[in-house]
Amino acid sequence: MSKQYEFHTHVCADDRAQVVVCGGGTAGTVAAIAAAREGMNVLIIEPFGCLGGSATNSLVTPLMTVGIPGNPMNSSISDEINRRSIEDGFAYQGGINPGYFDPSMMPFLLEQMAQESGVRIRYYTTPIHVIKENDKITALIVQDKAGLHAVEGEIFIDCTGDGDLSVLAGANYTKGNPKTGKNQPISLRYVLDDVDLKAFAGTVSDNSITSDGYSSCVKLHGDREVEKIMTRAMEAGDLTKEDLSYWQVFPLERAGRKGGLACNCPEFFEHVDGTDPAHLTETQILGKIAIRRHLAFYKKYFKGFENAHISNVSAMVGIRESREIETEQIMTFADAAVYRKFDDGIAQTNYPIDVHGMGDEYTCKTVKAEAVNEKPYYEIPYGSLVVKGVDNLLVAGRCIGCEFLVQASIRIQPTCRATGEAAGIAASMAIKNGVLPREINGCAVRARMIENGAVFAEG
């Protein structure tokens, strides 16, 4: 048995905000901006040194599409980010997956928008404990280089991605595939620069690499020419079987990064618990070994990589799924399968149920509605953001209240941004009206989102 220690200390409250957002990532940045634009005093607590989360620290580009005609942004702030990214010259709409952007440039814009809106940011700070009175959070104990501090607030929003704040506050959660107990695979993405993308595409003749340098995910023993090249490399010992289990690249040249190639790999299928520091450490170490192996493979088997070099490696491991927090309403696969709509739906999507895995574990399918003439998308209700058992806590992003298979569909950036905007607006409504988040009418949240410029498909 490990030796146990007791630790007691007095901590001074050195900060306070009406709305405290834990995690300045995909959902958290939007949640904070939304609340600030509603007149709230807002503080973001973020353990890294920039905003954006997976989009920046994990290099996740492009945004992907919600799968609804017109790709409506249920978040006006998300739409603004996309528009301003294009105006700033580091993004473009087009190609097979809309929403390409340079992840190295995104932090500049997100910080600018947060500051324009009056959001305060506290970087390099991590919540480690929650102070509660009955079922209400009164303060967070946070740690930074200067020590321990207390941060007080009225409404708290968990945008940590893994539901860290909710767990600290005592909320229940589920985790992983109920059939296997495993979380979705995790990745360590990287970006190459100075790739001759046309020469790269010219290596194959079957368009398995498009003319601008895009390749959809590679599967082991596939019939496309790029897969045959990779199989030969594996047989020669230049790649491993795991390298072929998932490989995908996205061009960044039209996003203002000449010769840029974003790589959605390597992907790991074991030790995939995003809440286990040993798993995260192993992925960082093994991932870097794999990335160097990938670069050597490109230079040996493809044209266009003569001058290519690694310019970015994810500072944060790419987590697809970890915890799903118990909320007042849980989105089920049955809801998605019948394209269920809710009066208080704060986000809409028809992104596929996208579960990564090896062999038969891999699932990527669009749900099919059973109802005749149903609009081809489902909605996320406001109740999926209201943490059960904690009076003044909302959750947004990929860890909202939903089943594992639904989480595989809602985890993309446009949907996470929409949940963040809804949470920020709901927090401001709760404070202005002196009520708890669970007492807020989700229909009013949706109406306010639309009033602010969010676009919802009619259904």
Segments from the language model and where they lie:
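Extreme N-terminal leader/targeting segments of oxidoreductases
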Residues: M1-V19
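Flavin (FAD/FMN)-binding glycine-rich loop and adjacent Rossmann-like elements that form
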Residues: S2, H10, S54, I81, ...
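Conserved N-terminal/central alpha/beta ligand/cofactor-binding core
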Residues: H8, R16, A34, M40-N41, ...
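Glycine-rich Rossmann-fold phosphate-binding loop(s) that bind the pyrophosphate
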Residues: G23-T26
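Residues forming the Rossmann-fold NAD(P)(H) cofactor-binding site
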Residues: T29
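Short, hydrophobic/aromatic-rich segments at coil-to-beta transitions
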Residues: N134-L140
